[in-house]
């Protein structure tokens, strides 16, 4: 977030002649894209022959986009039921006079009706829990989607009830370690606050 390009930052680091560079990314608002920047810096350092420990850009971009993260999670864990809503398609009939019936909108509402409530409605790109709303009924979600408040691509997901835990996986090139559980603190709405988590686990 310094305003320096990845190339200039990598050059500054390279001048220190490190044996290895380890990326440590902190959160940023409103967009938590620091990991993307550190991944770009790592690529530049690797071009200069400096070893790095950092996520690659593909993983960093996938983690930045909440829907891409959701798809990634679904490949190896049971994730909450959810749907991605493409803003332009959802409003297709308003911008295209030739569209008399918006089948995409019909599909979106059909899927939301199948969900268990409450659900969370969130922007696909915001940092942490910024902008996340809890909605308790189908009618509440329908009203939101048909209002002017719906102004970007969003996700609607079932809210998993109960205390929230997570973990971190550290490693490189196939050698990974799963760290002890993390107990997430939550906002008054019951949404995870990843910047205020407490780590603990078995001895």
Regions found by a protein language model. Give the residues of each.
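ATP-binding N-terminal substructure of ATP-dependent carboxylate-amine bond-forming enzymes
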Residues: 1-53, 58, 91-95
């Amino acid at each position: 977030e310094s305003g320096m390009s990845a190339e200039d930052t990598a050059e500054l680091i390279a001048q220190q002649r490190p044996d290895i560079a380890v990326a440590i990314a902190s959160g940023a608002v409103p967009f938590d894209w620091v990991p993307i920047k550190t991944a770009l810096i790592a690529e530049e350092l690797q071009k200069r022959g400096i070893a790095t420990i950092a996520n690659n850009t593909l993983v960093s971009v996938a983690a930045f986009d909440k829907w891409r993260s959701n798809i990634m999670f679904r490949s190896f864990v049971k994730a909450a039921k959810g749907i991605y809503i493409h803003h332009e398609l959802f409003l297709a009939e308003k911008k295209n006079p030739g569209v008399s019936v918006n089948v995409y909108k019909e599909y979106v509402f059909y899927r939301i009706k199948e969900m268990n409530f409450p659900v969370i409605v969130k922007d696909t790109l915001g940092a942490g829990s910024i902008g996340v709303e809890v909605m308790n009924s189908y009618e509440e979600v329908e009203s939101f989607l048909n209002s002017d408040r719906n102004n970007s691509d969003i996700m609607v997901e079932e809210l998993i009830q109960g205390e929230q835990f997570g973990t971190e996986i550290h490693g490189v090139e196939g050698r990974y370690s799963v760290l002890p559980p993390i107990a997430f603190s939550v906002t008054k709405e019951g949404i995870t606050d990843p910047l205020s988590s407490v780590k603990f686990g078995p001895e």
